[in-house]
Amino acid sequence: MENSYSVSLDRRNLLKHAGAAGLSIAAGSFMAAGLAEAQFNPPLRGRFAPGGSYILGQPGYRIPDQVDLGGGFMQRLEFYDRNERPFVMSDYRGKVTLVQFWHTNCHGCQAEVPALDKLAGRLEGSKFELLPIALSMDSQADIDRFYQRKGIKHLEVMRDRTSFVFSALAPRHPRLDAQATPTTILVGPDGNALGAYVGVAGWDQPDGVALLNHYIARA
């Protein structure tokens, strides 16, 4: 649904907020599905079909735990649980992980977060993790109210307190050329990016579930 995208941070604000590194990490790390289909051979149908909004990870691109901001300064890509404990993506190695960047005022997130909650109830286990990460505009209380209103039962509460993780990792929409929410990134058990979708993907629908199960079966 093209009208479900919520453009969260424009290029100027990203540069001010995260520095040039925030725009460069994901650049070139994802590619159109048609270019990589033969290398990965996943079931790409419906919204995940070549030529659409689903983009595959470049072979060997591992989601980083930190980025180089220049001058020898490394910035950790940390997000936090409700107890303010920091996490990085390598903490989820060993599982297929579906990361969702979202916020409570995002139009598309109103439907996708509850759908992913139900999906987590169906698929989460020793080989699969669903990881929602809310952006900095939401407080803990905002997320709790959203979860209560939407009846969220299975998803953890994670926050990207400065939206730096989002700005560093989220790809730009292949046609709109902007970062937006919701964005989902599918990560393999080795930490490599398998693919990403900017917008409401429909991971809970048959085509999305088939793609997830393809990787879960190989984890």
Regions found by a protein language model. Name each.
Residues 101-115:
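Conserved redox-active cysteine motifs that mediate thiol-disulfide chemistry
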Residues 39-76:
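N-proximal helix/coil linker or "cap" segments that precede and/or mark the start of modular domains
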Residues 77-96:
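A short beta-strand-turn-helix
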Residues 1-13, 20-29, 36-37:
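N-terminal secretory signal peptides
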Residues 111-152, 164-171:
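Structural microenvironment flanking redox-active thiols in thiol-disulfide oxidoreductases
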Residues 152, 162-211:
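Thiol/disulfide oxidoreductase modules built on the thioredoxin-like
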Residues 96-97, 182:
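Alpha/beta-hydrolase fold active-site loops
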